[in-house]
Amino acid sequence: MSGDASAELLRHLLAQRYGHEVEVPEGVAGLPELLHIAGQSSHRAWSAAPVAPELVKLLAACALAAPSKSFLQQADIIDVRDAARRAAIHALVPGMPWMADAPALLVFCANGRRFKHLFERRGRPFTNDHLDGFFHPSVDAALVMMNSINAAGAAGLVGCPISMIRNAPERLAEILELPPRVVPVAGLCLGFPAQARQVNPRLPLAAT
């Protein structure tokens, strides 16, 4: 696709998304990547094609390159492959049948344990035992999940985040055998799309 055609398609996608035109500067680089980001939608219908563990590992390696608060790297990705664990997690959110059918299920965790462990290794008292100990790892986990969605899209996959796994965090932590201070933030179903999705509207840019 030519640069002019890509720019026109990007303008069209953004107008669909926001209900108004967004200027695409002439000569802007990275139009294919911008088109992918502008056209994102959550998917809940998967093809029968499996998602190989090797592909998930590659996506995780790309996703974990996301920015991290103070380089502490307080986010983890769990690739839930065990059928019994998948069933137990799905039982926590039974109103989502498409979750059970997803070829891959990832759980993104805020890891507040890693920072505390650094203090323990040096024999020092932990001085950050307050809200930041949860907030910063949660932001790290969110950044890693968004990177995962972008990486998956680049590989031809689609996904849908699942916040409802937090409805029973203690039970989910038990299913995943998480240590203390490692908190599940969100799930992400991944698969190859069974069909195209429409662009979902967003508030106008002026609203932000």
Where would I find each of the regions flagged by the language model?
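Acidic, surface-exposed loops and disordered segments
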Residues: 1-208
